[in-house]
Design a protein with these regions (language model features):
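A short, flexible N-terminal coil/short beta segment enriched in small residues
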Residues: 2-35
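Active-site nucleotide/adenylate-binding loops and adjacent lid/helix of ATP-dependent enzymes
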Residues: 12-23, 98-104, 110-217, 226-227
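Conserved N-proximal alpha/beta basic substrate-recognition cap immediately N-terminal to
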Residues: 25-147
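Short, solvent-exposed loop/turn segments at secondary-structure junctions
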Residues: 26-27, 83-84, 114, 164-165, ...
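Short beta-strand-initiation
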Residues: 154, 227-229, 300-304
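Phosphate-binding site of ATP-dependent enzymes
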Residues: 167-293, 308-311, 321
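C-terminal active-site "lid" helix and adjoining low-complexity regulatory extension at the edge
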Residues: 293-304, 308-364
């Protein structure tokens, strides 16, 4: 049973507040963590420039109590931890973050917001939005066994586990002609280069463990995937930058794989993506908030949405199809995004009643 004593909140002097930037790492990294050596050094610097004191907090499950003590002294925490990492999940961390949030420490992104926004289920919940497509959700392997064959008959599908990162649990699936009375499929793991052929039932067995995360998502394969994926970075409800990448994941053609490369980052002013920016800021993010019952203040300080190209409209403009939303550990980021994050942190800290009152006293 965790202590029920209230957490302390830092007292503002000439500064706006004190926060942590938290990421996962081993004991060596924890002992040697500094602002200057951190991969988040630009975020630390941007926060300092706006009057926010930030410190590194390196997390692992076996130092949970020490991390709790660190967070107890602070006003908030920005969290960069993937859902899955070397076989470990976020279960213990999420419990800690819920605890500190209940005791007045601001958490971004809150685990409950991650569950709403940062899992593949959001693709099904928002499928009727104009970024959506023919998206199915399976709660059990039996439901998947019953419904997937009919969808495969219409074309290749992409199967996605509800929680994961780095392409883990993502498969392109195509139906094969039945030769021995058993349906077979051709599957391509997003983390691998070569497809394999297997009985459908064997593939379903592989997917059985995914249902521990609550569901499996099924979307049509987007034929224009080889043209690239556009990542729209969001700071709260405002666009903060873009990344464009020719990907290898789920791509089989050697020529297309040969053109794949690193993600190229640009500012929010990139003229190629201004239509996408307007859609995200003016239409899709408000609709997302309404669909998920989220307030503006609930939105993560940094999150992103990955878009593939769908069909073209009658006027020739590209339609964007949402592939996933990333909330848990959005990094690396375009250079300009650090300042956007810092400004959203300032806005959030100023909205806290205790800090707002302290700031008023200082300004007097």
């Amino acid at each position: 049973m965790m202590s029920a004593e209230p957490f302390s909140v830092s007292r503002c002097t000439a500064r706006l507040g004190r926060i942590a930037i938290l990421w996962r790492g081993d004991e060596t990294e924890r002992r040697g963590a500094t602002l200057q050596a951190s991969r988040f050094k630009d975020v630390f610097a941007a926060l300092a420039n706006l009057g926010v004191d930030a410190e590194p907090v390196v997390y692992e499950d076996d130092v949970l109590d020490a991390v709790r003590s660190q967070l107890a002294r602070l006003d908030g925490v920005l969290v960069w931890v993937n859902p899955l990492h070397d076989g470990r999940n976020r279960a213990k961390l999420d419990a800690l973050l819920r605890e500190v949030a209940e005791r007045g420490i601001w958490v971004s992104a809150h685990p409950d917001v991650v569950l709403k926004m940062g899992t593949k289920e959001v693709l099904h919940r928002t499928r009727t939005m104009s970024w959506g497509c023919d998206t199915a959700l399976y709660r059990t392997v039996d439901a998947m066994r019953a419904e997937l064959p009919a969808r495969l008959a219409a074309g290749a599908r992409v199967i996605k586990r509800n929680r994961g990162n780095g392409g883990q649990g993502v498969w392109k699936v195509e139906v094969l002609a039945t030769t021995d009375g058993r349906p077979s499929v051709r599957v391509l793991d997003a983390t691998k280069a070569e497809p394999e052929e297997t009985p459908l039932e064997e593939f379903l067995k592989r997917c059985a463990a995914y249902f521990e995360d609550g569901c499996v998502i099924d979307q049509p394969f987007q034929k224009r995937l080889s043209e690239g994926v556009v990542r729209c970075y969001m700071a709260g409800d405002r666009c903060a930058g873009f990344g464009h990448q020719k990907v290898k994941a789920l791509i089989e053609a050697p020529a297309a794989r040969a053109t794949a490369g690193a993600r190229l980052y640009t500012s929010k002013a990139d003229p190629r993506f201004q239509r996408l920016r307007r859609l995200m800021e003016d239409e899709w993010t408000p609709q997302l908030m309404s669909s998920l019952d989220l307030a503006r203040r609930d939105l993560p300080m940094i999150w992103d949405a990955d878009f593939m190209l769908g069909g073209r409209g009658v006027d020739g403009t590209d339609n964007y199809v949402l592939g996933e939303i990333n909330v848990s550990s959005v990094f690396p980021i375009p250079d300009e995004v650090a300042e956007e994050i810092a400004q959203r942190v300032v806005d959030r800290l100023k909205s806290k009643p205790d800090l707002a009152a302290a700031q008023t006293v200082v300004e007097r």
